[in-house]
A protein has these predicted regions:
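Conserved ATP-binding subdomain of kinase catalytic cores across diverse folds
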Residues: 1-44, 49-162, 202-402
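Gly/Ser/Thr-rich loops at beta-strand to alpha-helix junctions
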Residues: 165
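Ordered core of a single globular domain
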Residues: 172-221
Length: 402
């Protein structure tokens, strides 16, 4: 949706870190020129610090894991590690930390990745698939009382981020029916003729992608309303819709249908084996994630667009990085590195990866240097975007100015 692209650029303008978040394709192009071992895993494709967070498992447990898989594709494992480490270094600068502190946090991230891969290499495949990092454990293992309270508070906030809590804020009663509230330009209804029929057809196609038992659940709900929703940074400009459903008893269900385009890794790692890009995302997410949304599925629009569907939020909560201390960033980076190792071990050969990485910190230090170098590159790229907007070559819409 070209009319939304200026919002994307506006969000990327905020800082080098938001620029990095919105430029997965640019970094994929850069990473494709770097050496690799030839070992491949199911890669995230957009692995950065804010693509980790909390969410609910089907058993309603709160876990910490990767939570965004729009770009997932089988690819070299190094690409995820380098993007994650670079995001650590850029986030450090965003928080006014020194380059030494940023490098140390990036090194700690990679060290945690390397050491957890070694642990995974000693497990059976089933044990790797069963492994998860739940918030209760993270709270219990907090290094001090302050960190423990902070993690407990964030977990409490995550428990509130479910459809039942979100529903009153996003809807209003109109003529005896609940409707999504327009909040242009970030949430608005589609006035185009035939849009509702196309959407209903797409929902039926999505239904067919669900396992039989999940269809029984989904069939308890009926569609009431839908609207376009602008989400994230890199996703702005792609089609994303939020849909409101109700059960016969009046219980709400909010689903998000997000357009799935070919992965930014595809030009360099090879195209997906799945014709529907939504299916690519769903399969990759199920392969990498600890546990996935019970209503995760895919669909195709009549105009050739591909989508994947899931519950809106469902206890999804990203850890705020603003104001992070050097010690706090280091701890968080290590947790993310551990999560990435587990995700890679599910699809890759942990023993081979661990054997390559070895027991010394040589790889950790090398990626730490890379992270700082790429942080410099990100600053230059962000400055180029700022200059292009000021010169009028690129149109950006800063939402704070609306």
């Amino acid at each position: 949706m070209p009319e939304l692209v200026p919002i994307r650029y506006g969000r990327m303008l905020r800082s080098p870190f938001t620029f990095l978040r919105g430029s997965a394709g640019l970094m994929a192009c850069d990473l494709a020129t770097t050496p690799t071992t030839g070992l491949r895993v199911q890669a995230c494709g957009d692995c950065h610090l804010l693509n980790f967070g909390m969410f609910a498992t089907p058993e309603r447990n709160l876990v910490f894991d990767m939570n965004d898989f729009d770009e997932t594709l089988p690819a070299p494992w190094e690409w995820d590690v380098k993007r994650l480490a670079a995001s650590v270094a850029v986030a450090a600068r965003d928080n006014k930390l020194s380059d030494e502190e940023g490098r140390d946090a990036a090194v700690e991230c990679v060290r945690a990745y390397r050491e957890h891969l070694r642990e995974c290499s000693k497990m059976s495949p089933l044990e790797v698939w069963y492994e998860r990092l739940d918030m209760e454990t993270l709270i219990e293992k907090a290094p001090d009382a302050k960190t423990k309270k902070m993690r407990a508070d964030m977990a409490a906030k995550a428990h509130e981020r479910i459809g039942e809590y979100l529903f009153p804020k996003m809807t209003v009663a109109v003529g005896g029916r609940r409707r999504l509230v327009d909040q242009p330009p970030v949430l608005f209804h589609v006035a185009e003729k035939g849009a509702e029929k196309r959407f209903r057809d797409g929902v039926e196609d999505y239904r067919l992608s669900l396992p039989d038992d999940r269809r029984v659940l989904f069939d308890r709900y009926r569609l009431e309303d839908f609207a376009v929703k602008v989400v994230g940074i890199g996703s702005v400009g792609t089609r994303c819709l939020v849909a409101l459903f109700f059960s016969p008893e009046g219980h709400p269900l909010l689903l998000q249908f997000k357009e799935a385009c070919p992965s930014v890794l595809a030009p360099y790692a090879g195209k997906s084996v799945y014709a529907n890009q939504g299916q690519r995302v769903v399969v990759g997410q199920r392969l990498m994630q600890t546990s996935s949304d019970i209503l995760l599925g895919w669909t195709a629009g009549q105009r050739g667009y591909h989508f994947f569907g899931r519950q809106l939020r469902d206890m999804k909560f990203s850890i705020p990085l603003e104001g992070a201390t050097a010690a706090g960033l280091k701890r968080y980076a290590a947790i993310c590195g551990t999560g990435l190792a587990r995700a890679h071990a599910k699809s890759g050969d942990a023993a081979k990866l661990s054997g390559y990485l070895g027991k010394t910190d040589a790889f950790d230090q090398a990626i730490g240097k890379f992270a700082l170098a790429y942080a410099d590159q990100t600053v230059r790229d962000h400055a180029a975007l700022v200059a292009a907007v000021k010169a009028g070559r690129i149109k950006a819409l800063v939402e704070e100015d609306l």
